[in-house]
Curated annotation (Swiss-Prot):
Its cofactor is Zn(2+). This is Methionine synthase. NCBIfam families: PRK04326.1. Belongs to the archaeal MetE family. Binds 1 zinc ion per subunit.
C-alpha cells in the first residue's frame, strides 16, 4: 500500500454500470454479440469506473463490481454446492435469483483473481480495494436444502471464502473487504457469525475491512472488537449518525469507515454538509482512525448522480483535512 492522507476516502464497492455496458449485456443475452465482445465491454467499463473515481479524487477505489450481477448470486454460481431453480420476488417488481444449497460446499477455483488482476493493471493507484461477499450473508440469502443447520453451512462457506481471499493476496491484493450486510440481522446468530468471519480471514496477510449496513447495529456492537479485521465500515448517514454513540459505548477500537453519503437518495449532498457530518464523527473518534465512504454501494443510482456524490464526499473531506492541518495534524 502507498501512503494515504488523513481521513482517506473510499467507496464501498459497487458503482453504476455505464449505459453502453447494460446494452452490451442485453445484446449478448440476445445472441447478437460474442462472449469476447462482452468481456471487452466489461473491461472498458472497469476503466471508466476507475476514471470516475480518479476524477472525483477517491483515494482507495474499486472496479465498481461491474462484472457482477449480484453480490450473492455471483459467488453461488462459482462455488460447488449451489443450484438455481428460478427467480423469487424481493419487493414490487424486483426479482432475485436466490440460490439453493443442495450439496456440500466446496471451493472450485479462483473467482475474483482475474477481475482483480485486470483492475490492478489499469488502476491509478496501488491502493485498490477488492470486495468479496462474506460467508454469513451468502448463507442467509440462500435456501439451505442440504445442511442440518445454518451454522455448518456458514463455516463451510467461510473455508471457501478463505481460500479465495488467500488467492487474491497471492495475486497482489493489499486491501480486501468482506461484505456482511446480513450479519447483524439475527441476534441469535451474531456470536458464531463473527467466528465464521474470522475463519474466512484466518492466515490472511492484507489490510482487511468488513462492511455492514442497514441491520440492527446493537446486535453486533458487543462483538465488533472480536473481529480479526483492521477496519469496519458502516452506514451512518441514513441513521443520522446515531450509531456513533453505540460504538463509543462498546469501546469500538478498530479503524472506522464512516458512511457520509446516502446511497438511496438521489439528492446530492453538498461538500459543506459532508464536512459537518465528518466533524460530528470526529467528536467520537480520532481522525487517525477514520476513513470516509458512502453508506453502501452506489450501483442503484445513475452514474451522473453517483459521481457527483463522490465529488461532494471528497471535497467535504478536504475541508476537514485543512481544518485539522491548522490544528497541527499531518494530513498528507
Amino acid at each position: 500500500m502507498s501512503k494515504l492522507p488523513l481521513l482517506p476516502t473510499t467507496v464501498i464497492g459497487s458503482y453504476p454500470r455505464p449505459k453502453w455496458l447494460r446494452e452490451s449485456i442485453r445484446l449478448h443475452k440476445a445472441g447478437k454479440i460474442s462472449d469476447e465482445d462482452l468481456q471487452e465491454a466489461f473491461s472498458d467499463a472497469v476503466i471508466a469506473v476507475l476514471k470516475d473515481h480518479y476524477n472525483a479524487g477517491v483515494d482507495v477505489p474499486t472496479d465498481g463490481e461491474v462484472r457482477r450481477d449480484e453480490m450473492v448470486e455471483f459467488f453461488a454460481e462459482r462455488i460447488k454446492g449451489f443450484k438455481f431453480y428460478g427467480p423469487v420476488r424481493v419487493w414490487g417488481t424486483a426479482y432475485y435469483r436466490k440460490p439453493s444449497v443442495v450439496s456440500k460446499i466446496e471451493y472450485k477455483k479462483p473467482m475474483l483473481v482475474d477481475e482483480f488482476t485486470f483492475a490492478k493493471s489499469v488502476s491509478y493507484t496501488d491502493n485498490l480495494k477488492i470486495t468479496i461477499t462474506g460467508p454469513y450473508t451468502i448463507a442467509e440469502w440462500s435456501y439451505n436444502e442440504y445442511y442440518k443447520n445454518k451454522k455448518d453451512l456458514v463455516f463451510d462457506l467461510a473455508k471457501a471464502i478463505n481460500q479465495e481471499i488467500k488467492n487474491l493476496v497471492e495475486a497482489g491484493a493489499k486491501i480486501i473487504q468482506i461484505d456482511e450486510p446480513a450479519l447483524h440481522t439475527r441476534r441469535e446468530d451474531v456470536s458464531w457469525g463473527v467466528e465464521a468471519v474470522n475463519e474466512a480471514v484466518k492466515g490472511v496477510n492484507a489490510k482487511l475491512v468488513m462492511h455492514i449496513c442497514y441491520g440492527e447495529y446493537s446486535f453486533v456492537a458487543p462483538y465488533l472488537n472480536e473481529l480479526k479485521v483492521d477496519q469496519i465500515n458502516f452506514a451512518f448517514k441514513i441513521y443520522n449518525y446515531k450509531p456513533l454513540e453505540l460504538l463509543k459505548r462498546y469501546g469500538f477500537d478498530k479503524e472506522l469507515g464512516a458512511g457520509v453519503i446516502d446511497v438511496h437518495n438521489r439528492r446530492i449532498e453538498t461538500s459543506e454538509e459532508v464536512a459537518n457530518d465528518i466533524r460530528k464523527i470526529l467528536e467520537y473518534f480520532t481522525p487517525e482512525k477514520v476513513w470516509i465512504n458512502p453508506d453502501c454501494g452506489l450501483k442503484l443510482l445513475s452514474r451522473k448522480i453517483a459521481y457527483q456524490k463522490l465529488v461532494s464526499m471528497v471535497e467535504g473531506t478536504k475541508v476537514v483535512r485543512e481544518e485539522l492541518k491548522r490544528k497541527g495534524y499531518s494530513v498528507d
